Amino acid sequence: MRKYLVIFTLFYSYLPLHAQTDTSGKPYLQPTTPVCITHVNVVNVITQKVDADQTVVIEHDRITAVGATKKIKAPANALVIDGTGKYLMPGMTDAHIHFFQSGGLYTRPDALFLNSVYSYEKDQKWVKDNQADLMARYLACGITTVIDVGGPMSNFAIRSQLDTTILSPTAFVTGPLISTYQPPNLDKNDPPIVKVNNEQEARDLVKKQLPYKPDFIKIWYIVMSGQKAETTLPIVKAAIEESHANGLKVTVHATQYETAKLAISAGADILVHSVDDKILDNDMLQLMKSKNVVYIPTLVVMDGYDRTFTQQFNFTAHDFRYSNPFMLGTIMDLQHLDKKAPFDYHKMRNRFHIPSKEDSTMLTNLKLAQQAGILVVAGTDAGNIGTQHAASFRNELLAMQQAGLSNWEIILAATINAAKGFGKEKDRGSIEKGKVADLLLLDSDPVKDLNVPASIRTIIRRGVIIQPQQLLTPSPEALVQQQLNAFNARDIDAFLAPYSDSVALYDFNGKLLTKGKEQMRKQYSGFFNKSPDLHCQILNRMVQGNTVIDQEYSTITGRKPFGGIAVYIIEQGKISTVHFID
């Protein structure tokens, strides 16, 4: 009780001294005149060439002209953007996400049930409350279109909302997954996955979605142990037939060779995952090619589960910057849940190997599909445990690179192929006259370096000009959470990133402990190197304005756990001062 009283006293003692003022302006500009980007290098995904010294004219939300600068005259009243030395590419598409999932530890209770720690209802509320943040992160990563391949009926309301939201990608969605299996513990009022028991129920679930105008239909083709895939094939066929009869493409979750082959033979248009149990043979590849099947490999999603369940992470600076810090933080919670968790993550390391055999199979199958001329589309399955919204897309592209795809092939998979795969190529996916103006102005050539987010100078979404550096302005609490995540990952560079160069650390009596970021680096680098199992848990947090007070509890193998209170003060978007209380 005394500790909480100390926190309460500190909380209010710091408020008058450090009030936060919002001085930020709008991160976007809605032009009232044409926009003309001149002398720019256009990444042409149709010819697979970079066209030098081009001019692109935008009026309202559409591209009205593209061509050599010497041949295109800017409209008299145009807003001119000098693209000299810059590269213009189409906005990217993550073709496999889920709005109803947060990416955190508690978002799939059918896979990991931890309701006694953090309820599924709380996770679902968090997703709804933080939708704007997640969507801004997609834009910041250069993703101007997202495709939700299955969720509750509320997906349709989200699509409508995002359609009128400036700082958000365009969304294409469907409703509940038509499933051969009912996973436990998910929302029963507006279920994201619905088991159908016969052909008529499958048709009825397709029909139920029709008034909402789904962009496609999704089937979850799951075969349980001891069950034959043919047993539920009539259900799959019925759903496909009903969808096609209503002019809708069908996406199918079928990760096994047998279910994938049966689904394709039944008329499936899009496989939303890799086949991971068997190498694709020539018969299968020819079947996929002849049926014009779209292949979305989702290479990183199972790795996210494996790394979370074993607590073996490989976070990058990109992950720390572009992931929502609170959801990224939750996936390290297994290190302090102890007996509340259904398993010991240390023992899980004997079960889950990183990389897994399935990972190797998926990489091989992606390369085979690409070589066979099958339309490959980039997608992450973002929202699943350990697969963070927005940030995971770059990791997916790098995994595709690891599979042996060229940068051009990957860029196509993230742009024009996605548009073609979902029947949107007349409006999206390339920089051509008449198409929607979803564009990325880059400082460097993406054909040479796929790290697109780090290179973005300007985002144009439906003709609106957006400044990426203003999309992710972390709150004081988010900054503190970012450094906590990096502390637990023992990543010194990411840990120091939220701190100001002149940061000062004090004890409770005001004695200066550390001054400046470089001194912090020396102090904490050694600490991280000597503490492989370091983990800090937040027992209580209070936030007001730019002051954050954490009650912390830290564990290190071989040492007695220790606790304390840290008071963080944020100024000009950085942590400037920290007071420690042992």
Walk through the language-model features, giving the residues of each.
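A beta-strand edge to alpha-helix "cap/lid" segment located at domain peripheries
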Residues: 506, 511-512, 518-582
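Bacterial Sec-dependent N-terminal signal peptides
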Residues: 1-23
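Acidic, glycine-enriched loop/beta-strand segments at the rims
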Residues: 24-27, 42-55, 68-71, 388, ...
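Divalent metal-dependent hydrolysis catalytic cores, especially in the metallo-beta-lactamase
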Residues: 128-157, 168-176, 214-224, 249, ...
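Histidine-rich, glycine-flanked metal-binding segment
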Residues: 21-22, 27-29, 33-34, 42, ...
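Active-site neighborhoods of metal-dependent hydrolases
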Residues: 204-227, 275-403
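Short, well-ordered alpha-helical segments enriched in acidic and aromatic residues
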Residues: 489-506
